[in-house]
């Protein structure tokens, strides 16, 4: 507040000097003032293009040094029409007359001058600064205008300490909605915040992620470009090139040539131009001069429908122009009002006499010279802007209507302070020619944008409304069938740094922009989530994905199920073996006292058959989903059972060698072996050693059910962990040593009596056992699939079958098929024959 006060004190001196200067040498037009019960101010750019540099602290004389601005003229007339309609209305502000003071704000100095004029006390040449501004009554109650963001910010800052309502028809910058800085600012044009969001949605809709961005150097352009860059990059859009055109930019100068070169080199098909009309004209004249064609130009509302831009010679060759435009609205009767003004007899400008209250910028000689056939044409862009000025006047009138209590049909005529009117204007909500006029909490209008495309019919320009943008939130509605693209087959132009990757390919950024990338397929076991296109994510433990996948699939859980044909075959074979073992045990029990059974070991055969049955029973643990009991028992029980069988086989062969070869040669050893029950002791010790190995194995390297994920990317293997342990290896090495011992003993007994000579059968069974396990371990080294347990079971079944077949089947054959060989006489004859052979040698 102190800063504003200090500025106003300094400006008070300036305004006194300026008025003194103006009143000596200027004139004013009666069209700029209208007396009334309550006055409004209108700030309009009736002139523009004031290029001279001031060397003295003087206000620009718009009528003398600037060119006529047709657009500003239509705004000027829209306010005059609005006030006239309100004064003629019996419903709105009955028995109250509105007056106005209109100013030509062709330059910043003219704008400051006009603002200070409306802030001054009625009939005074100064602004009275006092501690309490609550009861300060300036010349006007409200201000309509000015046109640009820069000038609106200046005016709003000066009006803010006094809370004089200011309704701008053209200042769209988002910063003006900050009420801490501009508490009395309202507007009838949409906030640039929504324009920027609309542009981003437009870019996203057509997949344009690689764009160039150009703005003007005023607040409108710079703030708009900055906001658009922030929002666009936040939505994954990359800015290939960005530049701001200076106020001094001219067609063909080095600055614009450099800008054109960079635009061409950037390679972006889409260029967003967020600029004022004046610099947009310079820009597109440079584009035409450089022959920069084949692009899509996205226009901000300031120039999207401006004839000032469409009139650039050769602009129809530059490519496609899409734009965001203020929703097309017409001021009813404005054209007729302007025509009537052109036909009317104008009063001559009155001179400013010393001490009078007039201004050099309340004069428009061109306006007074208009005839019906020379008056400016009312075009779409000017009509939309004029409507914003028109409804700003009505918003003030409705606020004053409520403040004066006019709802009863008659208005009170008490003193009104600007801050009181500001509160009422913020609350207005009414229909104006079927258009709702109201303000949100930021005092922005409830409005919308049109999305337009330029059309050319030869040299004639027109535009097509493609859709609209509404808020909040911002939503874009476009009828794409109305768009005629300037490319092959009416296809949407592409504006990307890199084309989209194939499904399942991640983007690897090259350079500084995330829109520029290479496509690399996701590795096996990873997938590309659409939420992050730049990083392949790993699948879950129970999932898998092939290379280049955008989703994960559940892994297939595999194990040797009972329902499989392989399982049926193995199950039948193992069951058959068990039945044979059981049948053999019964057969041997029935013929226990026969020579064949006694020579096979007698009761020791039942231990051998039982151990084989235990090993066979353990094989059932390989079927179905692995469980803890199955994992604990299946390999250990098999190893222990086969150890007992091999121990019995070894000791049986060794015992025959002792009887027939060492009983006479080494009688002491023979008697010690028999008296100390060497056979049973050997079997017990050998089995105990294997039992110790197995117990250590089960305790230290406990076999447990496990889910294996590494071998196959798409499978989960259910297995036991026994084959990965040292205990498993030790147990099978121990059985290997026993097999070698049994083989050696059998080989040493190859020349025993025929009925006791089992070398051939035992050798065959042991060799088959070796081959079976060598085949299994070879298979396991190259194959890790679901049928590995089946291979393991087959090796075990082969070992058991070879042991049973090599040792017991020949004896079963003699018992069942050759009972003549199962006699004491036959065995005695065989022993006698062996004795004769040994004696002869």
From Swiss-Prot:
Keyword Transit peptide among UniProt keywords: no
Gene Ontology biological process terms in this record: sensory perception of umami taste
Membrane topology: Multi-pass membrane protein
GO cellular component, one term: plasma membrane
Keywords for the protein's UniProt record, in alphabetical order: Cell membrane, G-protein coupled receptor, Glycoprotein, Membrane, Receptor, Sensory transduction, Signal, Taste, Transducer, Transmembrane, Transmembrane helix
Transmembrane portions of the chain: 568-588, 604-624, 640-660, 681-701, 726-746, 762-782, 796-816
Glycosylation sites: 87-88, 95, 291, 479, 529
Stretches of the chain found on the membrane's Cytoplasmic side: 589-603, 661-680, 747-761, 817-841
Extracellular membrane side: 21-567, 625-639, 702-725, 783-795
Subunit and interaction comment: Forms heterodimers with TAS1R3.
Identification of the protein by name: Taste receptor type 1 member 1
Organism (species): Homo sapiens (Human)
Taxonomy of the source species: Eukaryota, Metazoa, Chordata, Craniata, Vertebrata
